[in-house]
Amino acid sequence: MAVSDLSHRFEGESVGRALELVGERWTLLILREAFFGVRRFGQLARNLGIPRPTLSSRLRMLVEVGLFDRVPYSSDPERHEYRLTEAGRDLFAAIVVLMQWGDEYLPRPEGPPIKLRHHTCGEHADPRLICTHCGEEITARNVTPEPGPGFKAKLASS
């Protein structure tokens, strides 16, 4: 199958499947808060200004799909905190890329609201996607999508 054949939609595409789980505004903001250390329901509700029923629903879904673990931290009264699982932590790069895009294309006059300081060197980080084989930065201009082992072309409806 030629590379140009990938320009149409296809069944089971990874971005679409991922967005079914995390593509909603509140879900992404809950993930952002979790990456910055917020674990408790009340603090999430306050920081985000999210309606409590909406927060409950999103957290329940995030636990069900395996992005968070619900862990008790108090027995009297019973209270839980929400900790990112490995799958949840692996979404960090996606959140950072969205944050960088917002800083670049929807800038605030006073500058970025959040900067990331790299623990190893102590400098503000400017994260990039890097090829693990050659070390070159990956952009939309220097990669080509190819069918992977899970590729299935979506049949056009008649």
From Swiss-Prot:
An example Pfam family from this entry, by short name, is HxlR
UniProt keyword terms in alphabetical order: DNA-binding, Transcription, Transcription regulation
> Which SUPFAM superfamilies does this chain map to?
Winged helix' DNA-binding domain
Any one GO molecular function term: DNA-binding transcription factor activity
According to the UniProt record, one GO cellular component term is: protein-DNA complex
- Could you tell me which residue ranges the HTH hxlR-type domain spans? 13-110
Query: Which GO BP terms apply?
Result: regulation of DNA-templated transcription
Q: Which PANTHER family match?
A: TRANSCRIPTIONAL REGULATOR, MARR FAMILY, TRANSCRIPTIONAL REGULATORY PROTEIN
Write down what this protein is called. Uncharacterized HTH-type transcriptional regulator Rv3095
Q: Which organism is it from?
A: Mycobacterium tuberculosis (strain ATCC 25618 / H37Rv)
